[in-house]
Amino acid sequence: MNPPKSAPDAQGLSYRDAGVDIDAGDALVDKIKPFAKKTLRDGVLGGIGGFGALFEVPKKYKEPVLVSGTDGVGTKLKLAFHLNKHDTVGQDLVAMSVNDILVQGAEPLFFLDYFACGKLDVDTAATVVKGIAQGCELSGCALIGGETAEMPGMYPDGEYDLAGFAVGAVEKSKIIDGSTIAEGDVVLGLASSGIHSNGFSLVRKIIERANPDLSADFHGRSLADALMAPTRIYVKPLLALMQKIAVKGMAHITGGGLVENIPRVLREGLTAELDQKAWPLPPLFKWLQEHGGVADAEMHRVFNCGIGMAVIVSAADADAAVSDLTAAGEQVWKIGTVRASREGEAQTVVV
């Protein structure tokens, strides 16, 4: 069978002609290696660039249980594209996964990321990965690998998507699953740094309606910077707290807000009653509620409303927990208590 004939003057095609620049990918790897190197920790075997990433579970664990979590940044990325601001979304990516595995008592060990785009901009991608590495440093886990996918025609120019996953370990006997939570326990709320990475489809709709000047001053910084503030990472202060106090349950306040995330750690028959006057609603959430005409119930169901992590401890341990977390740099409030559920009542109510 004869091969098909090409046009007389046609030149051979390359991958670059198809929109994939292998050299740009190699340049990115060279740029991000120093960022990843700063995240190295005990357990990492080998460096970036292998087919698989190797990690040895620390010997301090007698019966280690691996805990994994995966997530993205959601439509917060659309705002990042609009603002051409790419230095914070990497921390968002890490925070969403490490905070999730933390709630079961896990120490984050390593993280891998996936960066997908239509055309690779090396500087933009490097800025994003630098943020990922900074998030890994804040959570004490190693950035041990990742994937950069340049896929022509899949994404609009200047846009990309992010995904990542974290793996951690917890001693089998110390898994936190909420099973010891009882009536009378106290719910502590740790302050969020802002909107974090959930609810941005509604945020963008409010911005579209209000049409604000995003560069205008908003309580000492631009409104854009307030909206894009990276998700707070709670790993180090909470791991330290677990060494001193019996933490009974934790809830990372993500999509679904306080009212849908706290029930995930409560046994049937228990309700967390939260006092919305126990902590201040940050100005950014007031702005969103006012300009979007968003009802209180919807705010609590969509946004973190100033609380990024809920921690449940016994009443006897509550003051010590607040003191320790405050000393570690966290803002903490006693935001509620656990009680028996009333018939037909939700497992988290805000009063």
Curated annotation (Swiss-Prot):
- In its UniProt entry, the species of origin is given as Burkholderia multivorans (strain ATCC 17616 / 249)
Keyword Kinase attributed: no
* A Pfam family annotated for this UniProt entry: AIRS_C
Tell me the domain of life.
Bacteria
- Family the entry assigns: Belongs to the AIR synthase family.
Annotated coiled-coil positions are none
Enumerate the subcellular locations listed in this protein's record, separating them with semicolons: Cytoplasm
Q: Name one GO biological process term.
A: adenine biosynthetic process
| Pathway assigned to this chain's UniProt record | Purine metabolism; IMP biosynthesis via de novo pathway; 5-amino-1-(5-phospho-D-ribosyl)imidazole from N(2)-formyl-N(1)-(5-phospho-D-ribosyl)glycinamide: step 2/2
Which Enzyme Commission numbers does its entry carry? 6.3.3.1
InterPro entries xref list: PurM-like_C_dom, PurM-like_C_sf, PurM-like_N, PurM-like_N_sf, PurM_cligase
- Name of the encoding gene: purM
The entry's cellular-component GO terms read: cytosol
Q: What is this protein called?
A: Phosphoribosylformylglycinamidine cyclo-ligase
- One Gene Ontology term of the molecular function aspect: phosphoribosylformylglycinamidine cyclo-ligase activity
Substrates-to-products reaction catalysed? 2-formamido-N(1)-(5-O-phospho-beta-D-ribosyl)acetamidine + ATP = 5-amino-1-(5-phospho-beta-D-ribosyl)imidazole + ADP + phosphate + H(+)
Provide this UniProt record's keywords sorted from A to Z.
ATP-binding, Cytoplasm, Ligase, Nucleotide-binding, Purine biosynthesis
Q: HAMAP family recorded for this chain?
A: AIRS
